[in-house]
Regions:
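Acidic, glycine/proline-rich Ca2+-coordinating loop motifs
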Residues: 1-241
């Protein structure tokens, strides 16, 4: 399974020209860009781009170089990111005038889900990925608070929004008109492919041969054994602290 990379197109009076490579945007085949936010991160008046990537590819923070190009400075701004970043939103959450960042992931909400889904790397794999150039990525939502000095700090656990299970899009806006931005997270997946019981079932040699045969009936039969996991959406009210 491979992604298609990210693409940037320049508007030329109603016509678009791809400038991905010349602008410094990464377009790797392992990129699964599921979220993008365009905003002025560093306060210089120029729009920057944050891309949240699912699976192994890290997230990217492209800082506008004011000449039609961008530079990835994610490692300079963030100590770590979500492992499988899905949705992302950049909004001021504490009314200090600086943009903050929220990304969604798939950390289960309860102990049962935590123990029945395969959501984490073992330490050996984690270390090997760091040595291979991957970044510090953890299976959890991240709420990156802007420290106003070119750095962000993740306060998701402190704020109670680190775990919302299999989450996709996130929207941060003032839901109750009190002047403070609140958080909405949409959740759920039709078939839970991270279920460890299904993983053991799928590892059976007979089942693997059925899938590799390429016959639709065989594949459908396997997919029917993936459990469904309905999950509620989540809404968090900003307590202003």
């Amino acid at each position: 399974l491979k992604g298609g990379g990210d693409h940037l197109y320049k508007n030329n009076n109603g016509y678009f020209t791809e400038v991905t490579t010349s602008a410094g945007i990464h377009g790797g085949l392992i990129s699964f860009g599921l979220g993008v936010s365009v905003t002025d991160i560093n306060g210089d008046g120029w729009p920057d781009v944050f891309v949240s990537n699912d699976s192994y590819e890290r997230d990217y923070l492209y800082i506008n170089q004011k000449n039609g190009t961008f530079k990835d400075e994610m490692e300079s701004w963030f100590q770590h990111t979500s492992f499988s970043s899905m949705g992302a939103d950049v909004v001021d959450i504490n009314n200090d005038g600086y943009p903050d960042l929220f990304t969604t992931d798939m950390l289960p909400l309860n102990d049962y889900r935590l123990k029945t889904t395969g959501s984490f790397d073992n330490i050996s794999l984690f270390t090997d990925k760091l040595k291979s150039g991957f970044y510090y990525q953890y299976t959890k939502n991240c709420l990156q608070l802007n420290n106003k000095n070119g750095k962000f700090i993740d306060i998701a656990r402190y704020s109670g929004v680190a775990a919302t299970d299999w989450s996709w899009g996130a929207l941060i806006f003032d839901m109750d008109n009190d002047g403070w931005n609140d958080l909405y997270v949409c959740n759920g997946v039709n078939r839970d492919v991270t279920n460890l019981d299904f993983t053991d079932f799928f590892a059976d040699e007979v089942n693997q041969k059925m899938v590799l045969s390429g016959e639709k009936k065989s594949v459908d039969k396997i997919l029917q054994n993936i459990p469904r996991t309905p999950l509620p959406n989540k809404v968090y009210r900003n307590d202003k602290d």
